[in-house]
């Protein structure tokens, strides 16, 4: 007796084979996806009703406290603690949000006490199937990819995310336990490729701007800045010629300063009272009373000579 397990989408089917490898008779019941089973256990736990619980009619469930739900409950069932990734997974399985003011979700096969209906919930298929070689290309050539020569990502991977609360860069680590590793890896690779293309375009635009600025500077220097002319005269001769050119003007300025009325002579020495009570003659501020006495002495000598001659 042997068992063969096949994965059909997200549904695991077990078939019993015959003793000789032929097709067995009985086919086992379909098993729901692990994500649905874990979500049902998470919602049905009465100890966490203050965080997540069933709705009023037991056909919906409500996440009352998303921060605590992501921090305390998600790591116990999944390999992440991202509430946005959990919401995206619900969307891929056909869950819809009931009201806009709270996180209440519903699916016609997700009901309290009806765990056997979980096998009827299937993962949504993308509207445009990817090309056949694409699912195997990342695993075979991902070490030789050139980020600047990758083809644009197929549009099929951009239409299956209907609820967007977070960038798609974290999608590759959100559904590690439900069989969607290949699609998530392709989505993450496409997002990285798109970011690289955006950065490349920004760098090219910045390079073009710098080239234009460089050309403008060269044009300005060539058309608005005069070239420096070289002379054969030495700096010493040039300085002497400039000094000779300015020397007469400096001399005239100096003479004007001497002849100007603003230039006052030094103050005269203090006057001494005259002994004979007469006016004294001064020359450059010096009294000449001694010369007057000498003149009187000459007069006396002349009178004396005349008397002797008589």
UniProtKB/Swiss-Prot annotation:
Subcellular location: Nucleus
Disulfide bonds: none
One of the GO biological process terms: regulation of transcription by RNA polymerase II
Highest taxon, organism lineage: Eukaryota
Stretch list, region Disordered: 124-147, 257-310
UniProt keyword list: Activator, DNA-binding, Nucleus, Phosphoprotein, Stress response, Transcription, Transcription regulation
Region (Hydrophobic repeat HR-A/B), start-end ranges: 196-225
Pfam families tied to this protein: HSF_DNA-bind
Gene Ontology molecular function, alphabetical: DNA-binding transcription factor activity; identical protein binding; sequence-specific DNA binding
Coarse class of the protein's main subcellular location: nucleus
GO CC, alphabetical: nucleus
Biased composition (Basic and acidic residues): 296-310
Entry comment on modification after translation: Exhibits temperature-dependent phosphorylation.
Motif (Nuclear localization signal): 291-297
Biased composition (Pro residues): 263-272
Quaternary assembly: Homotrimer.
Annotated domain remarks: The hydrophobic-rich region (HR-A/B) corresponds to the oligomerization domain.
Family stated for the protein in its record: Belongs to the HSF family. Class B subfamily.
Described purpose of this protein according to its UniProt entry: Transcriptional activator that specifically binds DNA of heat shock promoter elements (HSE).
Protein name, entry field: Heat stress transcription factor B-4b
Source organism of this protein record: Oryza sativa subsp. japonica
Gene label: HSFB4B
């Amino acid at each position: 007796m042997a068992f063969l397990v096949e994965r059909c989408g997200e549904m695991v089917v077990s078939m019993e084979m015959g003793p000789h490898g032929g097709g067995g008779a009985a086919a086992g019941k379909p098993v729901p996806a692990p994500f649905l089973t874990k979500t049902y256990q998470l919602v049905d736990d009465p100890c966490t009703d203050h965080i997540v619980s069933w709705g009023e009619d037991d056909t919906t469930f409500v996440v009352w406290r998303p921060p605590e739900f992501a921090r305390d409950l998600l790591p116990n069932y999944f390999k992440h603690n991202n509430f946005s990734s959990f919401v995206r997974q619900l969307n891929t399985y056909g869950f819809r949000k009931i009201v806009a003011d709270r996180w209440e979700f519903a699916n016609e096969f997700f009901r309290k006490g009806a765990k056997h209906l979980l096998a009827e919930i299937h993962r949504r298929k993308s509207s445009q199937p990817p090309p056949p070689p694409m699912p195997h290309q990342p695993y075979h050539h991902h070490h030789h990819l050139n980020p600047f020569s990758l083809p644009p990502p197929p549009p099929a991977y951009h239409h299956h995310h209907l609820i967007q609360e977070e960038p798609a860069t974290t999608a590759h680590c959100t559904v590690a336990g439900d069989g969607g590793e290949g699609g998530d890896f392709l989505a993450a690779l496409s997002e990285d490729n798109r970011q690289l293309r955006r950065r490349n375009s920004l760098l090219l635009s910045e390079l073009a701007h710098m080239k234009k600025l460089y050309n403008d500077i060269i044009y300005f220097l060539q058309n608005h800045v005069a070239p420096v002319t070289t002379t054969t005269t030495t700096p010493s001769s040039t300085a002497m010629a400039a000094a000779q050119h300015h020397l007469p003007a400096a001399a005239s300025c100096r003479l004007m300063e001497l002849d100007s009325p603003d230039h006052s002579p030094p103050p005269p020495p203090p006057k001494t009272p005259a002994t004979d009570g007469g006016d004294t003659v001064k020359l450059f501020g010096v009294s000449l009373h001694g010369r007057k006495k000498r003149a009187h002495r000459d007069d006396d000598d002349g009178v004396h000579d005349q008397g002797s001659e008589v």
